[in-house]
């Protein structure tokens, strides 16, 4: 069946902001779907609230709406655009839930919109646990024994039937949000209460425990003629009980016999047929009991998922692209496989001659109070994938690509320590983020495969592989460097050992080891990912390294530029940097360069095989980058686009003779090194908060007295504000130094005077060495002290006088020219009274670049990439700042709901995982829409609770007056209430938590409060008011921890509920007029 001609326009729903469980894999699938459908001549309309995505670029769709993905908003877009069809399978759980809402509210029927890719019944049958259970029984497949509950009474009835331990999962939530494993009644009641609260349908599925079972996934694609292919089988290294997003996974499955594989294969096809997936990809998850071989179906997702992004990158088969074409009527045999240049049809199952390993990346160091144990609720924030010819090689490559300070199976424990064995037993039994390293330590401690298997049920095949690597390490330790001959070196490199790990074992520097390896003539070769195990020749350069005979890299002699990506997502370094890398590749390709991308993150658009001319799916480490440079000999390498990851390599690459283009590593160092930076600030007569760099406790206390409290303290060279704190007195400083000196490994600690109540600004600029153009000035809504990645910001600024803005422009230009920036630069400034302070300068791409580009209609990342390659801003015709005639607000999105026990207060350490954008004619409208996009429900009336620190008291009267005019009643704690009364306003007093009951938390628990403004100062007051914020989060009450955000909310509420939807393309056209 060729494509349908009865539909002309298709609406695609995106996934919204990046949250744990739903990351940039949906940008990758959505971008592919847009491309695939436009190629076929359809008009594509896209809705996504996340400005940091490639899919929201104005060139990706015919009409782009950066608007909240809520059915009310989408209904307005449908009314305006009148699409014929809606494709809901590309935007994760967010898009599916929104599509079901549109169906239920009658919007699709009213405007005659057909759902394609999956219909409402299919989605419901797969997502609704009881319907799914019945469907599986009808085709003779078992599901775990389970029951469904809509209340605590029903939950207890199910428990009687199943017993402990049991697994609890809320319906229609994603990444296992709200679920968990209960071993006793107390835990059971706590998890059920949380789950009922978080499930949009107030429904729980309670399963028998399958903990310790083996877990497998099948990625299946099916068309409407019932052609089915298995793209890839995936095996979880961690047994059941750990969410698949937090498991180490391996593709293809390693421990299945051929017969077992065929059984799973047939079962997964039967599942798709029964559920009715006719057009596109699904993943089906199975559990198998290692003792009895009993098989159960755990779940299926009738959409493109995290696993399908992994399967696409692992095999080279573009699932999302194919799924989009199937949704408009094609069948698999009609589509050709792009990777083999059309030599094979899409109905050929990929076959692979290598092993892929995915490791999750966690961010527990950001959330001190979080429970770091892995359960059925997803907690990882990113992932890394590696390709090798054996499991050992791909595992070791993934370990070093993770960027957690290891270069392989580094030891975690000092085994001579008396406590070490009990720590080891605990870490092996209860899964945590570092279990694989403890498994290696267990072998070092002399434990056997059987003993370890008995503790954690990890398949013995995997354990034997790790044991073998540990044996090799023990052997190398006894040798000197000269004793490693060519044969041994070759054997070790084939097993994936990094130069850095071998150097550590032998006791030499990494550089010495590399020189020795090169002398022995041991170099990697590069193989291609081609979907057909090299059966057909392929022109697609999607490459990975291994140590074998034949090299398939086949480099050209064209002018090449290499872009280093950002590695795995983490808090502080996410999709924004990937966006910049993609834009650099697109711009330089257009200009005739051959572009080479190096990255190891399977979720992103940068690792799509057609983003750049050549893709090396490799860890972004010194060794791996140098080997690629040796083969490709690029004319230039870009390090300023991938966040901190490539920047850390800049000096070493430069020393090895790699041509780094753009801002020089020395200039980057001048901005990052405090003492050199200070000299520059003084030379330009600019202001900086008084500061000092200290190397001991005594020195710190003396310096603090001179600078004056409060202080911002932090280790030098960090991204995302890791281990930053604000201290208000000497005992707090002493406590910080005791805890933080470990963070800084003898590197100094920085003290800055904290600018209390200052307004912060972010400025992005592009410089070509002679001219500087300001991209935008953004005003932060939260005042200084909140990390810039966590603060909401407004473009253009909503309350900065023009003369201050002009002064800031001048300062930024001076610094750019002084540093000799070539490319992008970001400056953070603070305004206290009339004084402008320079907080920091980053001569690289910053996380605001995508947001700014969407606001001003110009891609800064593309312009800066061309500047790095030698063009001037005049040649590029970008010579003056574009100031939009509308307001845009960027708001951060946080993962606090996933981490019970963590305080949802904002501070100098970054905690957000993603962002949304709201656009409006006024600041209030834009702010209101950004809140909506971040799934924050703004109250329209009720009772507002206010309690603020002394510094904020002068501002409280205006906020209280606004709220009363908007119809709120005010309650406040004694000190704040006194001020509000003094202004002649009506207020009710309420006790602080420390003052006895009934207190404010009682009011929150009784749902008597609808809005909370709670600001704090110092460690004690933060601790005292913790329960206010945590309860507000659990009861979904809008809570802000800064007075400035309180003022912004009043603006948003004045705007009211009526919001207009705006096409990005129209906004940009208005700027050019």
Curated annotation (Swiss-Prot):
Annotated residues that bind Mg(2+) 2 are located at 299, 301
Q: Which PANTHER family match?
A: CARBAMOYL-PHOSPHATE SYNTHASE [AMMONIA], MITOCHONDRIAL, CARBAMOYLTRANSFERASE FAMILY MEMBER
Return the annotated region ranges for Oligomerization domain: 404-553
A Pfam family found in this protein is CPSase_L_D3
* Residues binding Mn(2+) 4, per UniProt: 840, 842
Write down the chemical reaction(s) this protein catalyses: hydrogencarbonate + L-glutamine + 2 ATP + H2O = carbamoyl phosphate + L-glutamate + 2 ADP + phosphate + 2 H(+)
Binding-site positions, Mg(2+) 3: 828, 840
Residues the entry annotates as binding Mn(2+) 3 = 828, 840
Uppermost EC category? ligase
The identity of this protein, by name, is Carbamoyl phosphate synthase large chain
Gene name, please? carB
Where along the chain is ATP 1 bound? Answer: 129, 169, 175-176, 208, 210, 215, 241-243, 285, 299
**Organism from which the protein derives:** Pseudomonas syringae pv. tomato (strain ATCC BAA-871 / DC3000)
Q: For the MGS-like domain, which residue ranges apply?
A: 936-1073
